[in-house]
């Protein structure tokens, strides 16, 4: 494993998404992203670590109340729908995902059902769509009432801890 700093994670993930089958080769000062079977490449320079804020300790995921699998297709569809209707927010509520603008009662929204493992049907967890820029793939997702979620890539060694919005509620 190569430790390196990225100044703009969204830009880095967007750069990777330019390739359908990206291969990453980590050098001392940059990562070379290439497309399997082609001559296409992108050189992405690492950031100076002194300008990047890093956590001071490891994140410990508290007990989670809701679990589900987010397929690559579902993730892509939901983020595309959010972009199309200009929805900045996503709600996980009683087994469905909905993108909308929570500050506007008459905002357009897009929703789909999920197969969710939860002991309660009475919850509403809010995410900012801008925080869901993830490397393409399927994710095993755990959500805690302590306003944190854990997205673990089903096939790779990639995981994200994504904060929930303060309006999130479990058994409310």
Regions flagged by a language model, labelled:
Residues 45-54, 58:
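Short, well-ordered, aromatic-rich surface patches in folded extracellular/luminal domains
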Residues 1-45, 61-172:
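DNA polymerase processivity clamps
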């Amino acid at each position: 494993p190569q430790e390196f700093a990225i100044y703009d994670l969204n830009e880095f993930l967007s750069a990777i998404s330019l390739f359908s089958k990206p291969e990453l080769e980590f050098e001392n000062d940059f990562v070379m992203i290439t497309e399997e079977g082609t001559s296409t490449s992108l050189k992405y320079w690492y950031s100076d670590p002194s300008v990047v804020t890093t956590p001071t300790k490891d994140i410990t995921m508290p007990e989670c109340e809701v679990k589900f699998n987010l397929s690559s297709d579902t993730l892509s569809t939901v983020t595309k729908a959010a972009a199309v209707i200009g929805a900045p927010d996503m709600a996980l509520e009683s087994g469905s995902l909905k993108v909308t603008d929570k500050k506007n009662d008459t905002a357009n929204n897009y929703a789909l059902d999920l197969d969710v493992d939860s002991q309660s049907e009475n919850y509403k967890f809010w995410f900012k769509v801008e925080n869901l820029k993830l490397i393409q793939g399927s994710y095993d997702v755990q959500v805690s009432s302590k306003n944190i979620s854990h997205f673990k890539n089903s096939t790779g060694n990639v995981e994200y801890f994504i904060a929930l919005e303060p309006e999130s509620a479990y058994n409310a």
